[in-house]
A protein has these predicted regions:
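Short, basic, low-complexity termini and linkers enriched in Ser/Thr/Gly/Pro
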Residues: 179-182, 187, 207
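A polyanion-binding, active-site-adjacent surface
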Residues: 2-169, 174-175, 204-213, 217-238, ...
Length: 251
């Protein structure tokens, strides 16, 4: 059994019944027999389990799971309660506080976001303990690009949040090419986004899309345009404009 949630398994056409996803899963399971792999096996597909297709309203793409003990829980950027906030998540919270004018959360568990329809998807679903991006060649990207493409075809409004070049590349590869979506570069720190400049890409008359790009929230790049990008309020404005309830970003 793959552990992939039934709704996504159906939408994706049972990907683990065929190659290459079958081999990817087998390779990850073999690695987990030889060394510690994060997150735990039961959480490899946590993002898809907590956010089924019919509930997706936002997709936030990450790269691969945290590789230190006790951190990874199957949701991009999220850590378990009681775990020290990683630097990128700390910067996400700083931007949330600046954007919404509310105190930053203390805990790093983003499960409440996932349960509201925020798909927190890493493009690589496993990692070896202590070795960042060590499973990048297992082939998880085939599955996660299928998920991204499926999310882009959903009938409801969906916002895509692409922080950093790897996330942006994953999105555009998944949908085919850049001409299939209009993408706005978010402003540099200290500059407000142009009024009415939100990027909306329509995949059909009933499926408006918002695609937001910005530098990664890592301390190495957050000051190059992530801070000041206001993704949380802009997502909620997009959802409201399309008749959807806002995301409760405070935890």
């Amino acid at each position: 059994m793959s552990g992939l949630s039934s709704p996504w398994d159906v939408v994706l056409g049972h990907p683990f019944d065929r190659e290459p996803c079958r081999s990817t899963l087998a390779a990850a399971e073999a690695a987990a027999l030889l060394e510690t792999v994060y997150p735990p096996r039961e959480d490899w597909f946590a993002a898809l389990r907590l956010t089924p297709p019919e509930r997706v309203r936002v997709v936030i793409l990450g790269q691969d799971p945290y590789h230190q003990e006790g951190q990874a829980m199957g949701l991009a950027f999220s850590v378990r309660r009681g775990v020290t906030l990683p630097p990128s998540l700390r910067n996400i919270y700083k931007e949330l506080e600046s954007d919404l004018g509310r105190p930053a959360p203390d805990a790093g568990d983003l499960t409440p976001w996932a349960e509201q329809g925020v798909l927190l998807l890493n493009t690589v679903l496993t990692v070896a303990a202590g070795r960042a991006n060590s499973h990048k060649n297992l082939g998880w990207q085939t599955l996660t690009r299928q998920v991204i493409a499926a999310a882009a075809r959903l009938p409801q409004p969906v916002a895509f949040v692409l922080w950093g070049a790897p996330a942006q590349r994953a999105y555009f590869e998944a949908i085919g090419n850049r001409q299939q979506a209009t993408t706005e570069r978010l402003p540099l720190e200290g500059k407000a986004p142009p009024k009415g400049a939100d990027a909306v890409a329509s995949e059909g008359p009933h499926a408006p899309r918002l695609v937001l790009t910005a530098p990664h929230p890592s301390p190495l790049s957050a000051y190059r345009g992530f801070f000041g990008s206001r993704p949380f309020s802009r997502i909620n404005e997009f959802l409201a404009a399309n008749g959807e309830a806002p995301i409760r970003w405070t935890l």
